Amino acid sequence: MKLVILDRDGTINQDSDQYIKSPAEWKPIPGSLEAIARLTQGGWRCVVATNQSGIARGLFDMATLNAIHAEMHRRVAQVGGRIDAIFFCPHAADSNCECRKPKPGLLREIASRLDVELAGVPMIGDALRDVEAAAAVGAKPYLVLTGKGRKTREAGGLPPGTEVVADLAAIAARLAP
């Protein structure tokens, strides 16, 4: 199985310091939906791994998160793509859970549920925590320059082997030529 793991906010959709709290606030980054479609049509299974601490903060509930994800699924399907699964951490940053990126628990859950090894699996995100989580499980870290990506690159400290790409469309073109 060809698997690619995608961060959500800042990678697929526009990020917000106020959090994405409703389907109406979920706005795709230009080209990202088509990139997912390209990956899907190229035989890749696309899985999302996202921190969603807005739940723990009381900014939105599970029903709202499900509605946001339903909108994402709908919009991706409209252009011929598919997101095979969404894995998320609902905990606050100070919760000490094992699933909040940069800890590797969320990615290990993906490996367990899908019965796959993550060595070399592309993990694409816009934040240091995304590429650190990828490196922790032996996945291939890619940093996109959308969302927080430019600031992340400028801050330095990327794990060895991290590749920097303009956006999700650029890496999709490479993985599914």
PLM regions: where:
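Active-site neighborhood of HAD-like aspartate-dependent phosphohydrolases
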Residues: 1-47
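Metal-dependent phosphoesterase signature
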Residues: 12-30, 55-64, 78-82, 91-98
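Substrate-recognition element of Asp-dependent hydrolases with the DxDx(T/V) motif
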Residues: 32, 36-69, 85-95, 134
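Acidic, Mg2+-coordinating phosphoryl-transfer loop and its flanking beta/alpha structural elements
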Residues: 123-163
